[in-house]
Amino acid sequence: MQIFTRNINQWAVKPIDQEIATAFREAVSKANLKLVIAHDSYLINPASGDDTLRKKSIQGLVTELERADLLGIPWVVAHPGAAGEQDRTVAVNRAADGIIESLRKTKKLSSGILIETTAGQGTCLGDTFEEIAAMLHRIDKIKSLRERVAVCLDTCHVFAAGYPLQPKKSLDETIRQFDNTIGLSRLKVIHANDSKRELGSHVDRHEGIGQGEIGRAAFKLLVTHPKLKTVPFILETPKEGDDGKPDPKNDIRNIKLLRRLES
């Protein structure tokens, strides 16, 4: 399960009371949830060329890590940010350095950061495995931080970025590229999302499982692939029904479908 620990559209954040943190931990244990992760605020951009925004973003990551640690959450999923008008290589390095700074400022905590693959919409970084690998390589130079940074692969994002997920031969090649460039040992979570847009569109628009351009057949290949069998899949599919209102049945439908495809 993935949660937000704060309002994702505001910089200001209310502290978590210890009583609430304890109750949350007890609820997770009682529900027998195998994994709970957090997602960071959408305002955060550690790659920003604006020093003021970047400073706020780094502090934002620190806050996310502190809140996750208090709640017993091992990972915070974070987008690497956007380059804006900067050279992409410069922006990649700034993103990595921002993550380094946030991890150093929380060195006594155990929670870490999962860098999320992106669709590459606009100037967003992380739409190629090479860019993610470059960030990891820069962070890994500080050995004490290596265990606190890994990767979250989003199926919609990698598909929109141009990585095919079917037929099996194409999925095998995508996984091979990921392993050779980043390493499957760094893959901790998969966001399971279909895509409203076509392969290589670079448009980040999620769709329900089997209802988009990725398709049901590709998700069957994904959830049964031997190299992904130990990686948790977490939904980020749309919550709204046909009337545009939140419909909790959507999550139930998507979970049941993934489980059927896995069997």
Question: What residue ranges belong to the model's regions?
Answer:
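N-terminal pre-domain/capping segments
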Residues: 1-40, 44-65, 263
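Hydrophobic faces of well-ordered beta-strands that scaffold small-molecule active sites
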Residues: 1-3, 36-40, 76-78, 113-115, ...
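Active-site beta-loop-alpha junctions enriched in small/polar residues
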Residues: 4-8, 40-43, 81-83, 116-122, ...
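Alpha-helix N-cap and loop-to-helix initiation/capping positions
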Residues: 12-20, 48-60, 86-98, 123-134, ...
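Acidic (Asp/Glu)-rich catalytic clusters
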Residues: 16-37, 64-72, 103-109, 137-148, ...
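N-terminal hydrophobic or amphipathic segments with adjacent small-residue motifs
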Residues: 35, 75, 204-206
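Active-site acidic/histidine proton-transfer and metal-coordination neighborhood
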Residues: 46-150
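Histidine-acidic metal/acid-base catalytic patches
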Residues: 133-263
